[in-house]
Structure formats: structure tokens, C-alpha cells
């Protein structure tokens, strides 16, 4: 049996918890949402998750020094809580045909002109969120560019994140391979920013 609660008044809907002070929303006997006695989410719950799912039949290329991969990959977020954890995730297919090169990538905070949540410095090493050395085999040298980063929001100020990519010189192909035969592909780039409540 399905129960529907409809709050169609300007006063909204008020649900009162039991004497424990904790309110739980359940589905099929499993707790899906817990609101504490202070009226806040329990730690670990997702507050919001803006994302971009970018596809195109037009090839996107990147070569040389680290730079923004595409302005179409920008994701904006205004954290609800300064103490929240922001979890950035990128998943992309790439092709680096017939090349032996190192590739790098990192997230970038466009608003504050900085690379967020970097690993510590160590000598002259590049500080990045992802790297790979690609060996040449053919025109369809396919690889995955999957990386994450996480850190405290620090404030509730709006900010916009994007993805930067670079190589030692080879040209990387995204979204669509040069080969248009059945062995070529078109594939998406997915970028999301998840705010996780962390009181």
C-alpha cells in the first residue's frame, strides 16, 4: 500500500519525531534519510550533487601544458555548509593515438583561480589528481581518465570547478576518436561535485 502525504498549504508540512529526537525516512524497511534532533542531516548524507554529462560527435583535443579541457565541463556549486566535504569526480574516455607520452589532469577552481585539494609538494614533481604514461600501439590507443579529489568546502561561497588536462606533447582525443570505422568510438565525459554533510 502506498501512502501519500501532500502538503498543499502555505504552511508546508511538519513531521514530528518520536521521543528519541531523531527522524528517519525509510523505504522498504531501510533508512534512507536521518535528521538529527538539531534538525540537521546525519553525517555522510549527500546534500547536493551538481554534474555535467558532456557528449558530442565533435572531437575535443588537448595537447601540451595543463589547461582547461573545455568550458562545457564547468560545474558550479554553492555549499550549504562550510564544514561539508566536497567530493569531485571525473570519468572520461580518451585516445592518444600512436604516441608514447605522459598525460596529467587535475581539477581547477575557476572562481578562486587555484587547484583545490592538491597532494603535498615533493621536489619538482607535478602536483596533480591523475597521471598516466601511454604506450603506442595504434590509432585506437584507448584509455580511461578516472580521478577523484576531496576536501572541506571551507565556506558557503559559490564556486565553479572545471577539469584541466595536459601532455608531454601528444594530442589526446576526447568525445570522439579520429577513426570513424566500427573500431572508433564516441564516449562521454562525466564530471560531478558532491556535497557530503560533515558537521
Feature roles, as predicted:
Residues 10-17:
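Intrinsically disordered, low-complexity regulatory segments in eukaryotic proteins
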Amino acid at each position: 500500500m502506498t501512502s501519500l502525504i501532500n502538503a498543499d498549504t502555505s504552511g508546508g508540512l511538519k513531521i514530528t519525531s518520536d521521543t528519541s529526537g531523531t527522524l528517519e525516512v525509510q523505504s522498504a524497511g531501510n533508512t534512507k534519510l536521518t535528521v538529527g534532533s538539531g534538525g540537521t542531516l546525519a553525517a555522510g548524507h549527500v546534500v547536493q550533487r551538481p554534474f555535467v554529462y558532456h557528449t558530442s560527435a565533435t572531437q575535443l583535443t588537448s595537447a601540451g601544458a595543463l589547461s582547461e579541457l573545455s568550458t562545457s565541463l564547468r560545474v558550479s556549486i554553492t555549499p550549504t555548509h562550510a564544514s561539508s566535504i566536497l567530493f569531485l569526480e571525473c570519468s572520461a574516455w580518451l585516445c592518444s593515438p600512436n604516441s608514447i607520452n605522459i598525460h596529467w589532469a587535475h581539477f581547477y577552481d575557476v572562481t578562486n583561480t587555484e587547484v583545490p585539494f592538491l597532494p603535498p609538494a615533493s621536489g619538482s614533481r607535478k602536483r596533480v589528481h591523475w597521471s598516466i604514461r601511454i604506450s603506442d600501439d595504434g590509432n585506437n590507443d584507448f584509455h580511461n581518465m578516472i580521478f577523484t579529489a576531496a576536501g572541506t568546502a571551507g565556506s558557503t561561497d559559490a564556486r565553479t570547478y572545471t577539469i584541466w588536462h595536459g601532455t608531454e606533447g601528444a594530442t589526446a582525443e576526447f568525445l570522439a576518436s579520429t577513426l570513424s570505422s566500427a573500431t572508433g568510438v564516441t564516449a562521454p565525459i562525466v564530471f560531478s561535485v558532491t556535497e557530503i554533510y560533515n558537521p
